[in-house]
């Protein structure tokens, strides 16, 4: 999948997450941008600027090799290792609250897909897509918030491992 195909897939994904299931883009952009970035990516490591630079520099095959290697590194590391130096990365903070050492948009386009990837690893594929399907069915033509998504997520998997993952990525009351 090249950069243009990923962008088209991402934007089509907004037909489900943002057009049908709505959220406050400024306060909780991770919901639509993170979910569509995750779902549109065939290699987990989404369509950020680095992928375009890599593809331009190394060609599509070199880019695929680079991102396959990066994906495998992500899969072999824990959350804390991959997001080194961060004691948390709250996805449910406004767009302009950026984790130290990160760029604007990192939470929404990078960290949110990583959160979803690890949630899927914890839950298993069937339960993960069941969770996303339930979010879609429950909140079509409605506005959804992080708390509601987390409630559905926990209804599919309320393990200590999942709650530790959630604690890293979400500020809860």
Model region roles, listed by residue range:
Residues 31-36, 145, 149:
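Short, conserved alpha-helical segments within structured domains
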Residues 125-173:
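C-terminal, non-catalytic "cap/extension" segments appended to globular domains
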Residues 8, 12-17, 35, 39:
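Active-site His/Glu-centered metal-binding helix of metallohydrolases
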Residues 16-20, 25, 39-47, 51, ...:
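A generic secondary-structure signal for well-formed alpha-helical elements
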Residues 33, 37-114, 122, 139, ...:
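Acidic/His/Gly-enriched intrinsically disordered linker/tail segments
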Residues 1-9, 21-29:
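Short pre-active-site segment immediately N-terminal to the catalytic Zn-binding motif
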Residues 9, 112, 125-128:
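Short runs of predominantly hydrophobic/aromatic residues within well-ordered alpha helices
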């Amino acid at each position: 999948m090249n950069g243009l195909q990923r962008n088209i897939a991402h934007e089509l994904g907004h037909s489900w997450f943002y057009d049908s299931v709505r959220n406050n883009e400024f306060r909780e952009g991770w919901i639509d941008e993170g979910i569509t970035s995750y779902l549109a990516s065939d290699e987990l490591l989404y369509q950020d600027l680095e992928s375009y630079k890599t593809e331009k520099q190394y060609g599509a095959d070199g880019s695929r090799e680079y991102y396959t290697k990066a994906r495998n590194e992500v899969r072999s590391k824990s959350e804390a290792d991959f997001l080194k130096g961060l004691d948390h990365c709250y996805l449910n903070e406004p767009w302009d609250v950026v984790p130290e050492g990160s760029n604007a948009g990192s939470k929404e386009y990078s960290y949110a897909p990583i959160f979803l990837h690890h949630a899927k690893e914890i839950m298993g594929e069937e339960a993960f897509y069941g969770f996303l399907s339930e979010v879609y069915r429950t909140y079509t033509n409605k506005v959804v918030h992080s708390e509601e998504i987390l409630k559905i997520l926990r209804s599919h998997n309320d393990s200590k491992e999942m709650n530790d993952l959630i604690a890293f990525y979400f500020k809860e009351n």
